[in-house]
Amino acid sequence: MSEITKEQVVDFIANMTVLELSQFIKELEEKFGVSAAAPAMGMMMAAPAAGEAAPAEEEKTEFDVILTNAGGNKIAVIKVVRALTGLGLKEAKAKVDELPSSIKEAVSKAEAEDAKKQLEESGATCEIK
């Protein structure tokens, strides 16, 4: 059996599509029981100092972009969905046709707002949850 080098693994991962990479990360999380979320928030959200009350509600760090209406120019919306998700034409068209549909899941606020802006510029209506 030949040895696979770290460089070969990195090259293989670098050639994956966004969708393939997302699925790969989820499989790794499940297999090893870990999370790919940044650990810095956990350290910052450590137990409050004596006398301080814990915040009533934690600030949301992961957002979903939900397409609610494709608008009049479905072709432009499909192109944006493909660019954002890395999906093929058939899969992107299915997301645009089957509303509401999740376009991006568990992304940062900035990434969610950027995706929403791109979708709205193409004529779609979407929301961030």
From Swiss-Prot:
This is Large ribosomal subunit protein bL12. Pfam families: Ribosomal_L12, Ribosomal_L12_N. NCBIfam families: L12. Homodimer. Part of the ribosomal stalk of the 50S ribosomal subunit. Forms a multimeric L10(L12)X complex, where L10 forms an elongated spine to which 2 to 4 L12 dimers bind in a sequential fashion. Binds GTP-bound translation factors. GO terms for molecular function: mRNA binding; structural constituent of ribosome. Keywords: Ribonucleoprotein, Ribosomal protein. GO terms for cellular component: cytosolic large ribosomal subunit. One of its GO terms (biological process) is translation.
